[in-house]
Amino acid sequence: MGPLLVWHRGDLRLHDHPALLEALARGPVVGLVVLDPNNLKTTPRRRAWFLENVRALREAYRARGGALWVLEGLPWEKVPEAARRLKAKAVYALTSHTPYGRYRDGRVREALPVPLHLLPAPHLLPPDLPRAYRVYTPFSRLYRGAAPPLPPPEALPKGPEEGEIPREDPGLPLPEPGEEAALAGLRAFLEAKLPRYAEERDRLDGEGGSRLSPYFALGVLSPRLAAWEAERRGGEGARKWVAELLWRDFSYHLLYHFPWMAERPLDPRFQAFPWQEDEALFQAWYEGKTGVPLVDAAMRELHATGFLSNRARMNAAQFAVKHLLLPWKRCEEAFRHLLLDGDRAVNLQGWQWAGGLGVDAAPYFRVFNPVLQGERHDPEGRWLKRWAPEYPSYAPKDPVVDLEEARRRYLRLARDLARG
């Protein structure tokens, strides 16, 4: 019989990989990545980021003497094809809890001539908890600290290599791909920024954060390892940062239990909200031409870099939903495809939270003032000057809507719905 196949999906790494180590304990392995067209229907920047990290994973296999197959096509066709060609004894992978991942894995299992073994992914809390939580705090209280992460294999058995990895022009500079770069970034953050994370995490320029989200989104960096290393250092910064990592798992938990949140608000009252299909307003928001400095700077940075701080994301999202009344789903999708870290579950949770649509305890009547938010979280205006230099301050300049009138309009509509 042949080797065991280790099928990498949202886990483009060798460290802290239960499926890889389980397979290695049972025999020689060959890695596999399937370039799934269902996941590659996105922007060039996101395709390029994914492909460069697949390339880095292949190099990691090679450096340890192993081989990674890369096949292009539908997983329920290509995984069985690889298993047959290699005469594989079984396929190992980490469990996916997304709606598409569960559908995909069911079809692959049906088509495979050998067993498919799915092992738990190293979440901080498993998304498939039997009780469904809609509020973050009781969910987070279940967390008791990170379990020790698993080490990467020192060596991998030799095997045949198959498949080419295409090139894609991202249209913008990308971070250094691969888990070595991710681990180096984690070390740098823990040493230099974690001690002040609690005080600086809300900076609009994102310099108080880790900037590791593009690696987490593809599983290039294990969240369990990240939490473990942060908790070893301790302090308020570590506590706050691990809480943010738990928000990621809360996002997966929500999408697992409420898969329909991808299409409609968690709060059923807001399914009847009168969103405004205004193409001119949508384009003004999307292109960063609203006349509202914080929003314009945020959208321009996102277009230019594929990254945005959490504080800027919340403000850009809430302005679209609450001030402009734009359809939240269209905006969420457009926003996600600009992000290098465009994780569907995380972005859906973020937009429904910012929009007051039922995620967590975020009240619908909370409406950020983008002027005060800018002054508070970029007090010297350096971030604003970099991305929207035509604005001397955070005061609006010929805005597409009057901020106070738009706030009152939204609250009137939302309260009418909330009261039934």
Curated annotation (Swiss-Prot):
- Where is the region Interaction with DNA? 244-251, 310-311
Keyword flag Oxidoreductase = no
What keywords are assigned to this protein?
Chromophore, DNA damage, DNA repair, DNA-binding, FAD, Flavoprotein, Lyase, Nucleotide-binding, Plasmid
- UniProt feature, compositional bias: Basic and acidic residues: 159-170
GO MF annotation list: deoxyribodipyrimidine photo-lyase activity; DNA binding; FAD binding
The Enzyme Commission number assigned here is 4.1.99.3
Give positions of region: Disordered: 147-176
Q: Which InterPro entries match?
A: Crypto/Photolyase_FAD-like_sf, Crypto/Photolyase_N_sf, Cryptochr/Photolyase_FAD-bd, Cryptochrome/DNA_photolyase_1, DNA_photolyase_1_CS_C, DNA_photolyase_N, Rossmann-like_a/b/a_fold
Q: How is the cofactor bound?
A: Binds 1 FAD per subunit.
- UniProt catalytic activity: cyclobutadipyrimidine (in DNA) = 2 pyrimidine residues (in DNA)
Cofactor(s) listed in the protein's UniProt record: FAD
Extract one GO BP annotation from the record: DNA repair
Looking at its record, which EC class is this enzyme? lyase
- Report the protein's function: Involved in repair of UV radiation-induced DNA damage. Catalyzes the light-dependent monomerization (300-600 nm) of cyclobutyl pyrimidine dimers (in cis-syn configuration), which are formed between adjacent bases on the same DNA strand upon exposure to ultraviolet radiation.
What protein family is recorded? Belongs to the DNA photolyase class-1 family.
Q: What is this protein called?
A: Deoxyribodipyrimidine photo-lyase
